[in-house]
């Protein structure tokens, strides 16, 4: 994948860059693997905003991606690399030998015609899914399960990879992209390699319109609001916060305050917190 930049014809194109989509081999999705996804616009079941600054954007079909990789021992060939509007990573369309079709996250370096397989005795190759205890130390992995059989929950973003750093007893220790070091049960599955589309982080949207196209609405600063709307609001002109530190719109400490519950059971599995 490459990145295309534009000449400064307009203020929007001056800073903008886009993917060249050279890695895409199939323009339309597999119809049987798509479903309609309702745009909730950041609202819950009562219509109350629970996630601010969301709404609008282009309509999308959801691609049903196989995060479980539970078709053990059945080889599959990569039939196409496709665009997915719901994530930065590309997805790979697999044709299994028994006729089934599935999508997976496309690892970096995978191409049309590559054969992949999942299972305990799978060969050690990019795109294959194995239990963590079968994966050698130092290997880059992605789409990692936290609970065996539940499907991959960690390390799924474009360009992301975790590293296997230790094995001891029933647990395998991983270094995550955030530099957090944590233990995961050894029977949990992970996929060999790094998630593809590694250049996604370098793309610049360039203008507000492209951000709106993604379904993100303007993020208004609290300091320009009224006191009734935000703890930072009010005052004459540009006023300081007027509190011991910056606050969220609901009056809780922001910017640096730790939010993780200390009583969380999984805290004992975290060897080193993220930086």
From Swiss-Prot:
Q: What's the name of its gene? A: rplB
What functional role does this protein have? One of the primary rRNA binding proteins. Required for association of the 30S and 50S subunits to form the 70S ribosome, for tRNA binding and peptide bond formation. It has been suggested to have peptidyltransferase activity; this is somewhat controversial. Makes several contacts with the 16S rRNA in the 70S ribosome.
The protein's UniProt keywords, in alphabetical order, are: Ribonucleoprotein, Ribosomal protein, RNA-binding, rRNA-binding
Q: Member of which family?
A: Belongs to the universal ribosomal protein uL2 family.
Q: Which GO terms describe its cellular component?
A: large ribosomal subunit
Q: Which GO terms describe its biological process?
A: translation
Q: Where is this region: Disordered?
A: 1-55, 218-275
* An example molecular function term from Gene Ontology annotations: transferase activity
Here the disulfide bonds are none
State the organism named in the record: Crocosphaera subtropica (strain ATCC 51142 / BH68) (Cyanothece sp. (strain ATCC 51142))
- Annotated protein name in UniProt: Large ribosomal subunit protein uL2
Listed SUPFAM superfamilies: Nucleic acid-binding proteins, Translation proteins SH3-like domain
Describe the subunit structure. Part of the 50S ribosomal subunit. Forms a bridge to the 30S subunit in the 70S ribosome.
Composition bias of kind Basic residues appears in 259-275
Keyword Ribosomal protein applies: yes
Taxonomically, which superkingdom? Bacteria
What SMART domains does its record include? Ribosomal_L2, Ribosomal_L2_C
